[in-house]
């Protein structure tokens, strides 16, 4: 299966513009032979939407947009992040979600389980955690789709610093996922890339599954997202990497077993910090 990693720069609350960006990248990926296009966390709303989520019209506009994209979808299939209604009767009423869209409808959806409430994150204020999960079926592939923090709780890698009891990725593997896909909006900080690469490598190796990690890119207010999306083999080897600090699109063929394109451009802390500052200021002014 040819899978496109669509590392796009979305704007918080600019739902029509984000939809247009999604469609543009789907068309580009389709021309390259993609069968599935993966977008970052909360693609439709941008990340983080914060108190915009308290506005019913905003949530409804996002739901209408995901319905529109579902009707528009044919081939390739899409994995798109959006804000869904949760099933909680007494909770927040919303979920951080991803939908599998194909052939004119929503084929499946997933609600994020692990909601970070530390540092720059406050997702527990806005969202209810997921309550059920299962792999998404696309053709003969069983996709173990998770969202950002869901990947950051491996019991072996975080042996002494584990924040949650439950590991959605482990559960996805237990239920027969052939392939792991994590859609993220993971902000940049100095030194984080090295830790993230080690973790993703360890998770893919422990579960013996190819792992596709798609990160957001761009600046949204005080947060800067560095992109750097990656693919890891079942042996934990990095097979591909997208550019850091700019939009990018890469096709990964699941038949690939040896390292391919490595597009990362900034390999030391000073260069990464400079690139982050330039991107953050540029997007703050532009958006």
Question: Which residues does each predicted region cover?
Answer:
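Enzyme catalytic cores with a strong preference for nitrogen-chemistry domains
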Residues: 1-287
């Amino acid at each position: 299966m040819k899978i496109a990693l669509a590392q796009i720069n979305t704007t918080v609350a600019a739902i029509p513009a984000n939809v247009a960006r999604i469609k543009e990248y789907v068309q580009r990926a389709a021309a390259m032979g993609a069968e599935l296009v993966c977008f970052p966390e909360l693609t439709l709303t941008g990340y983080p939407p914060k108190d915009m989520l308290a506005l019913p019209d905003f949530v409804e506009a996002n739901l209408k947009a995901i319905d529109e994209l579902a009707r528009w979808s044919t081939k390739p299939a899409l994995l798109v992040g959006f804000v869904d209604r949760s099933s909680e009767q007494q909770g927040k009423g919303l979920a951080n979600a991803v939908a599998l869209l194909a052939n004119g409808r929503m084929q499946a959806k997933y609600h994020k389980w692990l909601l970070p409430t530390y540092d720059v994150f406050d997702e527990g204020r806005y969202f209810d955690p997921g309550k059920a999960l299962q792999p998404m079926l696309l053709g003969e592939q069983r996709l173990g789709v998770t969202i950002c923090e869901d990947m950051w709780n491996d019991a072996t890698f975080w042996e002494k610093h584990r924040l949650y009891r439950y590991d959605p990725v482990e559960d996805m593997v237990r239920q027969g996922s052939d392939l792991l896909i994590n859609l993220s909006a993971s902000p940049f900080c100095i030194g984080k890339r090295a830790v993230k690469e080690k973790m993703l490598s360890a998770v893919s190796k422990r579960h013996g599954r190819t792992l596709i990690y798609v990160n957001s890119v761009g600046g949204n207010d005080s947060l800067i997202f560095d992109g750097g999306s990656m693919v890891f083999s079942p042996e934990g080897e990095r097979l591909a990497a997208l550019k850091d600090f700019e939009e990018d699109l890469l096709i990964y063929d699941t038949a690939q077993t040896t390292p391919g394109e490595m597009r990362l451009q900034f390999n030391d802390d000073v260069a990464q910090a400079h690139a982050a500052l330039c991107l953050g200021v540029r997007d703050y002014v532009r958006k």
